[in-house]
A protein has these predicted regions:
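Alpha-helical transmembrane segments and their immediate juxtamembrane boundary regions
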Residues: 29-83, 175-230
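Conserved non-transmembrane functional hotspots
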Residues: 2-32, 77-172, 176-177, 233-287
Length: 287
């Protein structure tokens, strides 16, 4: 593990290649969020195809939900791919900017990461330039000055401060999205349940129409349980470092943060844009 001071972290994080990496990571996570919405939409259309007229041919009535379930699987795969890349890019950023086990990446892995960052940035140059110029205090929020320090810190203290900022932001964003997710989930289940109650469809049609959305709900439940478990481990690891600020505990906490980023539980980008400046100011004043 490299020993990085807060001054070194502040300078290193704003090097062009790291700004592009953070921008690419944000684009990947935002793309994952959008693909996840499309997957939900496909599942919902499949579920509500139960309203198709009885007079239609059986092939059409059963084929439409099957088709949309297949489309949902494609969007799910695209979601997972972008979550992977977003987490991978952030993992590289932290490893090299904070200085926690940067040697874990081979030369070929590093080349792939830099190529990915350049490809994403080149595809969105205007938005990319705005993002790398703006900080979290600006509108729209950018990726410059990703980590901020109110006082100079050395070694493990500086690294742990970066980790605390990651944990703090994640909790604040989670608190804002939970009510929306719960309301949306209950609404979907209630609407579909009511529809099933009032309609009389064959078992085959019912299974075809409901399978996609049921699997999607179980997938979301599974991912959120994983997310909660890792979050509890992160909180415990954070408390350990507050008592024993040692390198081995910082490395363990970072591995948990990297693991959580790879779980398909995403921020809501629309909320992040609205509250980023406010939360950035709040952390600066309270830290």
């Amino acid at each position: 593990m490299l020993i990085m001071s807060s001054q070194e972290i502040q300078t290193r994080q704003n090097e062009m290649k790291f700004l592009k990496i953070q921008y690419a990571a944000r684009r990947c996570f935002n793309a994952a969020e959008n693909y996840n919405y499309f997957a939900w939409l496909a599942c919902i259309v499949s579920a509500f195809s139960i309203f198709l007229p009885d007079a239609w041919h059986t092939f059409i009535v059963n084929g439409i939900p099957f088709t949309f379930d297949f489309v949902a699987v494609i969007f799910y795969a695209l979601t997972q791919k972008n979550v992977y890349w977003g987490a991978y890019l952030r993992k590289y950023f932290d490893a090299n900017v904070i200085g926690i086990t940067p040697s874990q990446f081979s030369k070929s892995e590093e080349q792939n990461i830099l190529e990915k960052a350049e490809t994403v940035f080149s595809a969105h140059p205007h938005d990319g330039l705005i993002q790398i110029r703006n900080t979290g205090h600006d509108v729209p929020p950018g990726v410059k000055n990703w980590y901020e320090f109110s006082t100079p810190l050395n070694a493990v203290e500086a690294q742990f401060e970066c980790q605390k900022q990651n944990i703090w932001w994640d909790k604040k964003m989670s608190q804002r999205k939970i009510p929306i997710i719960v309301f949306g989930g209950i609404s979907i289940i209630a609407c579909f349940g009511f529809s099933m109650h009032i309609l009389n469809r064959s078992i085959l049609t019912t299974l075809l129409c409901s399978s996609g959305i049921i699997l999607k709900l179980f997938e979301r439940l599974y991912e959120n349980i994983k997310y909660i478990k890792v979050s509890l481990q992160i909180d415990g690891s954070k408390e350990t470092i507050e008592i024993k600020p040692e390198e081995k505990y910082v490395e363990h906490l970072q591995s948990l943060i990297d693991e959580r980023r790879g779980i398909n539980v995403l921020e809501l980008n629309s909320i992040h844009k609205k509250v980023a400046a406010k939360l950035s100011a709040l952390y600066s004043k309270s830290s």
